[in-house]
Amino acid sequence: MSHTVKIYDTCIGCTQCVRACPTDVLEMVPWDGCKAQQIASSPRTEDCVGCKRCETACPTDFLSIRVYLGAETTRSMGLAY
């Protein structure tokens, strides 16, 4: 089952999510929108196992990263009945 990893622009570029990911789904890329000048990116979502360690590791109060598991992806996008 595929999962969707969504990175929000509230990311502070701390790299906690990247270090927490056991399958190297995430990486940091250059971005001018925060003081750290980088933001998390999820180029390999097909490797996501849905453990949500990245969410747990995120130090922001507004969870800059979310993992939507299988059917949850459909619901979150308003595609379910």
From Swiss-Prot:
As cofactor, the record names:
[4Fe-4S] cluster
Q: Which Gene3D superfamilies match?
A: 3.30.70.20
Q: Does the keyword Ligase apply?
A: no
* UniProt membrane topology term: Peripheral membrane protein
Annotated Gene Ontology cellular component terms: photosystem I; plasma membrane-derived thylakoid membrane
Which EC number(s) does UniProt give? 1.97.1.12
Protein name, entry field: Photosystem I iron-sulfur center
A single Gene Ontology molecular function, please? oxidoreductase activity
Q: State what this protein does.
A: Apoprotein for the two 4Fe-4S centers FA and FB of photosystem I (PSI); essential for photochemical activity. FB is the terminal electron acceptor of PSI, donating electrons to ferredoxin. The C-terminus interacts with PsaA/B/D and helps assemble the protein into the PSI complex. Required for binding of PsaD and PsaE to PSI. PSI is a plastocyanin/cytochrome c6-ferredoxin oxidoreductase, converting photonic excitation into a charge separation, which transfers an electron from the donor P700 chlorophyll pair to the spectroscopically characterized acceptors A0, A1, FX, FA and FB in turn.
Q: Where does the protein end up? A: Cellular thylakoid membrane
Family matches, as Pfam families: Fer4_7 (PF12838)
Give the keywords, sorted.
4Fe-4S, Electron transport, Iron, Iron-sulfur, Membrane, Metal-binding, Oxidoreductase, Photosynthesis, Photosystem I, Repeat, Thylakoid, Transport
Q: Which reaction does it catalyse?
A: reduced [plastocyanin] + hnu + oxidized [2Fe-2S]-[ferredoxin] = oxidized [plastocyanin] + reduced [2Fe-2S]-[ferredoxin]
Q: Which organism is it from?
A: Mastigocladus laminosus
Q: Name one GO biological process term.
A: photosynthetic electron transport in photosystem I
> Which NCBIfam families does this one have?
PS_I_psaC
Give the cofactor binding note.
Binds 2 [4Fe-4S] clusters. Cluster 2 is most probably the spectroscopically characterized electron acceptor FA and cluster 1 is most probably FB.
State the superkingdom. Bacteria
Q: What is known about its subunit structure?
A: The cyanobacterial PSI reaction center is composed of one copy each of PsaA,B,C,D,E,F,I,J,K,L,M and X, and forms trimeric complexes.
Q: Quote the record's binding site residues for [4Fe-4S] cluster 1.
A: 11, 14, 17, 58
Q: Where is the 4Fe-4S ferredoxin-type domain?
A: 2-31, 39-68
User: Could you read off the lineage of the organism from its UniProt record?
Assistant: Bacteria, Bacillati, Cyanobacteriota, Cyanophyceae, Nostocales
Q: Which InterPro entries match?
A: 4Fe4S_Fe-S-bd, 4Fe4S_Fe_S_CS, PSI_iron-sulfur_center, PSI_PsaC
Positions bound to [4Fe-4S] cluster 2: 21, 48, 51, 54
